[in-house]
Regions:
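Phosphate-group recognition and catalysis centered on beta-loop-alpha active-site segments
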Residues: 1-188
Length: 188
């Protein structure tokens, strides 16, 4: 099962920070997932003026050759997708609830892998051009996982922190979990 460190090792370190990403690397996660605003600022919520945030360029440099990157586009505006793609290497994965942003990313960089979150206004069929479908844990079903697999989508679930639930999802055919606890997920 793919272990995707949700905002880094956010159970142990402040989320979306360089120490959280470094810790995820130490714990052996397959990917770090991070949130990006306006294409370059790493934060889950809208940036607050005067506060220091890591930049996407800093995170790319930290992770290069050490761990995979999944970059979630938060409320992308015109130009945000292009700015984000300029900073990412070809093996990065873009994630979003925003289907048009992912369509645009694939047009700008054919072959880039994308994760379309489903269930909040986007159906499994709406994710058909993505690499993976991201399901919210409380809404994932056997039928949804099967539908994703039938469309050759990699089924991923967020945010799962209990080992028993991780094992259950693996039995359902889920390929990976976004987790605040990559330490526990790696032990499975």
């Amino acid at each position: 099962m793919l272990v995707i460190a949700h905002r880094g090792a956010s159970f142990e370190r402040p989320e979306n920070t360089l120490p959280a990403f470094e810790r995820a690397i130490e714990l052996g996660a397959d990917f770090v997932e991070l949130d990006v605003w306006r294409g370059t600022v790493v934060t889950h919520d809208p940036p607050v003026q005067g506060r220091r945030y890591p930049t996407l360029a800093e995170v790319v440099e930290l992770c290069r050759g050490r761990i995979g990157l999944m970059v979630e586009l938060k409320r992308p505006r015109a130009g945000d997708v292009a700015r984000t793609l300029e900073l990412l290497e070809d093996d990065a994965v873009l994630v979003s609830f925003n289907r048009p942003a992912l369509v645009q990313s694939r047009a700008l960089r054919p072959g880039i892998r994308t994760v379309q979150h489903v269930g909040f206004g986007v159906s499994i069929r709406g994710a058909r051009d993505a690499w993976a479908a991201g399901f919210y844990d409380a809404r994932v079903t056997v039928r949804g996982v099967a539908a994703a697999r039938a469309l050759d989508l990699v089924p991923l679930v967020y945010t799962v922190n209990e080992p028993a639930r991780m094992r259950e999802l693996e039995r359902l055919g889920v390929a990976g979990v976004f987790t605040d606890r990559p330490d526990l997920a790696r032990q499975l």
